[in-house]
From Swiss-Prot:
Cytoplasmic side: 115-132, 181-182, 240-251, 294-316
Entry's localization field: Golgi apparatus membrane
Source organism: Xenopus tropicalis (Western clawed frog)
Topological domain ranges for the Lumenal compartment: 19-93, 154-163, 204-218, 273
Residues linked to a glycan: 35
Keyword terms: Glycoprotein, Golgi apparatus, GPI-anchor biosynthesis, Hydrolase, Membrane, Signal, Transmembrane, Transmembrane helix
InterPro entries: Per1-like
Protein's membrane topology: Multi-pass membrane protein
Protein name (record): GPI-specific phospholipase A2-like PGAP3
Family: Belongs to the PGAP3 family.
Signal peptide per UniProt: 1-18
GO cellular component, one term: Golgi membrane
GO terms, biological process: GPI anchor biosynthetic process; GPI anchor metabolic process
Length: 316
C-alpha cells in the first residue's frame, strides 16, 4: 500500500520549547555530572537492564528522559501547556520503546504489507506482466515499515534518516508502479528509462540529505512533490479506465482515504496518557488500507492475464 501523501515525512526536529528551558538544561547537566561519570557510570551500566543496553540507551539519554518529565511536571503544575522536546511530544517509554503506540502501529502496517505480499504471490501467476513489479513494490513497502518501527522504537540520527529515506523509496516506487501500469507494458523501454531516472533521483535526494546538515524543509518539499505526482497519476489513470475495470474503485478509495486520514497529522495534540498521539492514530488508521490496495493489485493483475489470454488466437 503506497503512502500517496507525504505529510508524515514533514517532522521538523529542531530545538523546541521544552529543551530550550533553562530548568531542563540545568537538570540534564546536573544529572550527567552526578550519574554519568566515573564509578557512578559503572553503577548505572551495571543496573541498566540488558534490553536498554542492547537498544543503545545511554546514561545521558536516561538523564534527558528523566529531566523531560521533571520539566513537564513543572509546566503542568504552573498551568502551562505541555511543551515539546527536540521537536517531539513527551512520550512515556515502555521497556525500550520510545514511542510505543507509533512503533506498534508501524509494526502492524508492516505485518499487513507482508501478509498481502504473500497473498498476492499465492493468488497471481508469475506469468503476469506486473508480477515482478508488484512484488518489488511490496518488498520496498515492508522495508519502509520495518524502519518506521525501528525509528519509533529508538529515535537516533540513523533511524530517523532510514525512516525518511525508506518512506521516500516507497513513494518513488509507487510512481514507477503507476508508470509501468499506464504505459510501461506497451512501451517497456520508456518505463525502464523512467525507472533509471527515478533511481538517480532517489540517489541524489539521499546524497543531498546525507552529506550535509539534514534539510527538513527540502525533504518535506521534495516528498510532497513526489506524493502529489503519484496521487494525480493514479487518479487520472483510474478515471480514464473507470468503465473498463470496475475494481478501480479500490485504488481510488485508498487514495482518497489516505488524503483524508493524513489530516490527523494536523491535529498535533499532546499524547493521550502520554502514549497515543495524532501520528500514531494516523498509522493505526492506515493498516486496513493495505488489504484494499493489494486487493486492487491482485484484481488488476488477474485482469491483465485475462485480456492477454483472450487475445491469444485459438487453434481449432
Amino acid at each position: 500500500m503506497a503512502p500517496f501523501l507525504v505529510l508524515f515525512l514533514a517532522g521538523v526536529v529542531a530545538a523546541s520549547r521544552g529543551d530550550r528551558e533553562p530548568v531542563y538544561r540545568d537538570c540534564v547537566t546536573l544529572c550527567e555530572r552526578n550519574n554519568c561519570t566515573g564509578s557512578r557510570l559503572t553503577d548505572f551500566r551495571a543496573e541498566q537492564p540488558l534490553y536498554m543496553r542492547v537498544t543503545g540507551w545511554t546514561c545521558l539519554d536516561d538523564c534527558r528522559y528523566q529531566c523531560m518529565w521533571y520539566t513537564v511536571s513543572l509546566y503542568l503544575k504552573e498551568g502551562h501547556e505541555v511543551p515539546q522536546f527536540h521537536g517531539k511530544w513527551p512520550f512515556s517509554r515502555f521497556l525500550f520503546f520510545q514511542e510505543p503506540a507509533s512503533a506498534l502501529a508501524s509494526f502492524l502496517n508492516g505485518v499487513a504489507s507482508l501478509l498481502m505480499l504473500l497473498r498476492y504471490r499465492s493468488s497471481v501467476p508469475s506469468s503476469c506482466q506486473m508480477y515482478r513489479t508488484c512484488l518489488a513494490f511490496s518488498m520496498v513497502s515492508v522495508n519502509a515499515w520495518f524502519w518506521s518501527t525501528i525509528f519509533h522504537t529508538r529515535d537516533t540520527a540513523l533511524t530517523e534518516k532510514m525512516d525518511y529515506f525508506c518512506a521516500s523509496s516507497v513513494i518513488l516506487h509507487s510512481i514507477y508502479l503507476c508508470c509501468m501500469r499506464t504505459f510501461g507494458l506497451q512501451y517497456p523501454s520508456i518505463a525502464n528509462g523512467f525507472g533509471a531516472f527515478l533511481v538517480l533521483l532517489f540517489a541524489c535526494h539521499v546524497s543531498y540529505l546525507t552529506l550535509g546538515r539534514f534539510d527538513y524543509s527540502y525533504n518535506m518539499a521534495a516528498n510532497t512533490g513526489f506524493g502529489v505526482l503519484n496521487l494525480m497519476w493514479w487518479l487520472a489513470w483510474c478515471f480514464r479506465r473507470r468503465f473498463h475495470q470496475p475494481y478501480l474503485w479500490k485504488c481510488v478509495l485508498v487514495v482518497i482515504s489516505l488524503q483524508s486520514l493524513a489530516l490527523l497529522e494536523l491535529l498535533d495534540f499532546p499524547p493521550v496518557m502520554w502514549i497515543l498521539d495524532a501520528h500514531a492514530l494516523w498509522h493505526f488508521s492506515t493498516v486496513p488500507l493495505h488489504f484494499l490496495f493489494y486487493s486492487f493489485l491482485k484484481d488488476d493483475s488477474l485482469y491483465l492475464l485475462k485480456i492477454n489470454h483472450d487475445d491469444i488466437p485459438k487453434l481449432d
